[in-house]
Swiss-Prot record:
Belongs to the eukaryotic ribosomal protein eS1 family. InterPro entries: Ribosomal_eS1, Ribosomal_eS1_CS, Ribosomal_eS1_euk. It is found in: Cytoplasm. Component of the small ribosomal subunit. Mature ribosomes consist of a small (40S) and a large (60S) subunit. The 40S subunit contains about 33 different proteins and 1 molecule of RNA (18S). The 60S subunit contains about 49 different proteins and 3 molecules of RNA (28S, 5.8S and 5S). One of its GO terms (molecular function) is structural constituent of ribosome. The lineage of its organism: Eukaryota, Metazoa, Ecdysozoa, Arthropoda, Crustacea. Its main location: cytoplasm. Keywords: Cytoplasm, Ribonucleoprotein, Ribosomal protein. GO terms for cellular component: cytosolic small ribosomal subunit. This is Small ribosomal subunit protein eS1. GO terms for biological process: translation. It comes from the Eukaryota. It comes from Artemia franciscana (Brine shrimp). PANTHER family: 40S RIBOSOMAL PROTEIN S3A. It holds the Pfam family Ribosomal_S3Ae.
């Protein structure tokens, strides 16, 4: 047995003492995520990012992040009536400590979608590619089910193939008409109460009674060139109003978006 000090262990011990444990969160900042003004609850959460260091700018890392939020949370509803609908919001601009988002899609939760499918009825689906007036290309998916007549003694309520085609055609026409007639802001405002699905249900009743009609999914396929003015228009109701007193004592009300930072002056 060798007697003496183990030089390797002694060296490794010294190196271990010199190491400093640095908390990674000391190099990060929190940013507030703001939803468009179409929704009741605009503060949807916070996100973390590394501070600007060298060529790595914090705002560049934040842009493009996608947040998925339940409609019940966006509308501030405690009931679970609309919690199965999820809106996707994408970060497009950073103003101060605020992250301004825009609509990036909509989807259903898997459990809700699976619960709709039942026996003894016909499932009718359609998908349409529609362009809004401000050049957003959306792919809209619609779903509906045939409804049993209360007076009928039959167990099933299957629709004929010609009726399914007629209903699908009517779905396509209504979706195209409603989405293409306005910009993205108007399209989102129609998706929140699902008014398009209600119109489809009423219009298709003459062909075959249907129920549980939903716009189940929306994808943003193409976007126009980024326009700061239109993004601020989506967040228009979130402007901060301040009262400034002039030299003669009169007050002037000014309106600025949340997170506004004044430009740097070249000279004073």
């Amino acid at each position: 047995m060798a007697v003496g000090k183990n030089k390797g262990l002694a060296k490794s011990g010294k190196k271990g003492l010199k190491k400093k444990i640095v908390d990674p969160f000391t190099r990060k900042d929190w940013y507030d995520v703001k939803a468009p003004s179409l929704f009741t609850n605009r503060d949807i959460g916070k996100t973390l990012v590394n501070r600007t260091a060298g060529t790595k700018i914090a705002s560049d890392s934040l842009k493009g992040r996608v947040f998925e939020v339940s409609l019940a949370d966006l509308q501030g509803e405690s009931e679970a009536e609309r919690s199965f609908r999820k809106f996707r919001l994408i970060a497009e601009e950073v103003q101060g400590r605020y992250l301004l988002t825009n609509f990036h899609g909509m989807d259903f939760t898997t459990d809700k979608l699976r619960s709709l499918v039942k026996k003894w009825q016909t499932l009718i689906e359609c998908s349409v590619d529609v362009k809004t007036t401000d050049s957003y290309l959306l792919r809209v998916f619609c779903i509906g089910f045939t409804q049993k007549d209360q007076r009928s003694q039959r167990k099933t309520c299957y629709a004929q193939h010609t009726q399914v085609r007629a209903i699908r055609k009517k779905m396509t026409e209504i979706i195209t008409k409603e989405i293409s007639s306005g910009d993205l802001k108007e399209a989102v405002s129609k998706l929140i109460p699902d008014s398009i699905a209600k119109d489809i249900e009423k219009s298709c009743h003459s062909i075959y009674p249907i129920h549980e009609v939903y716009i189940r999914k929306v994808k943003v396929l193409k976007k126009p060139k980024f326009d700061m003015g239109k993004l601020l228009d989506m967040h228009g109701e979130g402007a901060v109003t301040k009262r400034v007193t002039t030299e003669d004592g009169t007050g002037v009300v000014i309106s600025r978006p949340e997170g506004y930072e004044p430009p740097i002056q070249e000279s004073v």
